[in-house]
Amino acid sequence: MTETPLAGFTVVVTRPARQNDALVQQLQAQGANVVAIPLLAIDPLDAPTQCQKIDRQLHDLQQCQLAIFISQNAAEQTLQAMAERNLVWPAHIQVFAIGSATTAFLAAHGISATSPQQMNSEGLLALPALQQVSGQHCLVFRGLGGRETLAQTLRERNATVDYCELYRRQLPAEAAAHWTKWLSDLQNRTALICINSIETLKHLQAVDPAASLRDNLTLVVPGERVTRAATAAGFAHIITANDATDNAMLHTITLHAAPTGIRHD
């Protein structure tokens, strides 16, 4: 008999649409009722001035010694932009990446990247290879806006740091309607909500400003930063995964669903 430890549990996944597939399959294989409500969309920057800056930075890559990819989205958008310009990644650049998915994506495209076990800026900054960077030029690939810890610390270590911002993180237009409908279907039952970033948490608050049925929802979040943000936002039921990978989120959900946990049916 197939073991289904998540039978009777409802789990909502909120990543951009095509990025949910693997986790959805894993959750369903363990018996969960999975609902996909993307609360994040990745939209490439397309304003003329933004495109001109990206174009200039990508053509000047030969001048960089270091490159950092903040996420898989950053890696995907960068390689897509380079392909559109018929550019090839320079072999001399030392590449760093946050997250195993980012590293795997780059590897699949022939780019070897160093990634910290602690999948955040602090973990990256602790790597031995980034301690002595004086005089080196580092380009950080990311979305519009974000944390400044990485660039600030590398500049304190006398590196020259620039951002190549290729996309914006948006709330999908249909998200609020999907969320409202799902809440009406939920009624008095409970559910687990996978919130993979602070940006996604903000979007959850945007689609549900009245915090409907908040007591019925348990957030599954990666790491202490998102945990603190969720607590500050008023969520009382939070479980914390080691990171945002599918395996870490699934492991945390499965532990929560163990016999000592609360059944969600």
Model-identified regions with their sequence ranges:
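Signature of uroporphyrinogen-III synthase
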Residues: 1-265
